[in-house]
Amino acid sequence: MFEEPEWVEAAPAIVGLGAATAQVRPATAPPVKGRKRRHLLATLRALEAASLSQQTPSLPGSDSEEEEEVGRKKRHLQRPSLASVSKEVGKKRKGKCQKQAPSISDSEGKEIRRKCHRQAPPLGGVSAGEEKGKRKCQEYSSLHLTQPLDSVDQTVHNSRTSTATIDPSKPSPESMSPNSSHTLSRKQWRNRQKNKRRHKNKFRPLQTPEQAPPKASIEETEVPPVPKSDSQESRAGALRARMTQRLDGARFRYLNEQLYSGPSSAARRLFQEDPEAFLLYHRGFQRQVKKWPLHPVDRIAKDLRQKPASLVVADFGCGDCRLASSVRNPVHCFDLASLDPRVTVCDMAQVPLEDESVDVAVFCLSLMGTNIRDFLEEANRVLKTGGLLKVAEVSSRFEDIRTFLGAVTKLGFKIIYKDLTNSHFFLFDFEKTGPPRVGPKAQLSGLKLQPCLYKRR
């Protein structure tokens, strides 16, 4: 006679839907976001609370009376949890949310309730067909409702877990573990296993130093590291070597300046007072010449090897007797200090040789000092007429090569060969024509060469 209100039939359907979906979905659902979703949630909870207070009639689409009785028992068990949830959430927003409840047509609502009640699970478990029906029901309801019922499922599940601690007669989710494994899809199960492997060691307790595996035995077998003292000593040794090299370089530059800025007699006295100074100077000199593309002594030795081995050679400023070791000729070696037993220590302006006793006189990078004229006159004295004078000198020392050659010819020589192609030194060959043509008081400005000074690097 009187039509029952719409919410009487809609409430049990929604309750059944919540019960069905609560067992399918996992326990952890994403939180409800948005104002409209919160309004819909509050409306649904209010409808559930109102429906539980009345006697729900049996639907005409049920299979048997036993299923109706099982549904009543299940709703009776869920009554305190749903009531508590509705009291907590629905009191503040009940009136406001009822105004914004979504409208569903009568035909759509009846069809949803019919499908959900037909697929209500028994208490014993959930079969595969019933599970399939639940999924269809969820998909159909999600198409017509603006808000999915994830939040409802989460609240129902939380209320069940809270009542499960109070009511021991209700089976816990852990006791339904055999059936819960079937509710996961293959992709969900795979993701769960992956997360387990990923977080395997995340919550493992930290090991105390006593529980840590012993490493002392491994370290004892290894080679002990180099002590700090040795490394410090090696650094100190390297520093000392660097400082010694710098000091040697500074002293070499000082000695080189003294040799070029004074007469040969002063240089001889210097090396007589400090014999180690000549060794230091010679090491520095060899270090500088080693960087040259060609050593001038090697070039002179190559020229002498093409001449007869019977020619007597006088090497003025021989150093370490490199020329005497490179040729077969008899060589008289003269220098300010001795680095070899074959060296005769003397002033190159006064060598202990007879007049016209040698065939070749060599000045290889040895025209040092301010008395170069004395060296060349001494070479003219000991050379035979027609003898060969070979001069090799640093190219940067010559300001005007023509004036230098003119001054040498006035001392009784004539130029027969010159090589200006080398970037580091010039090579000249002179032949003795006779005694000097100028007196000892004559000025020969062309014989003045620039001092070869080394810059600090």
From Swiss-Prot:
Gene3D superfamilies assigned to the protein according to its UniProt record, in alphabetical order: Ribosomal RNA-processing protein 8, N-terminal domain, Vaccinia Virus protein VP39
Residue(s) carrying Phosphoserine: 62, 64, 105, 172, 177
GO terms of molecular function: methylated histone binding; methyltransferase activity
Subcellular location: Nucleus, Nucleolus
Primary subcellular site in the record, as a coarse category: nucleus
Keyword tRNA-binding in annotation: no
Keyword set includes Protein transport: no
Cited InterPro entries: RRP8, RRP8_N, SAM-dependent_MTases_sf
Residue sites binding S-adenosyl-L-methionine per the record: 282, 317, 335, 347-348, 364
Role according to the record: Essential component of the eNoSC (energy-dependent nucleolar silencing) complex, a complex that mediates silencing of rDNA in response to intracellular energy status and acts by recruiting histone-modifying enzymes. The eNoSC complex is able to sense the energy status of cell: upon glucose starvation, elevation of NAD(+)/NADP(+) ratio activates SIRT1, leading to histone H3 deacetylation followed by dimethylation of H3 at 'Lys-9' (H3K9me2) by SUV39H1 and the formation of silent chromatin in the rDNA locus. In the complex, RRP8 binds to H3K9me2 and probably acts as a methyltransferase.
Subunit structure, as described in the record: Component of the eNoSC complex, composed of SIRT1, SUV39H1 and RRP8.
Name of the molecule in the record: Ribosomal RNA-processing protein 8
Gene: Rrp8
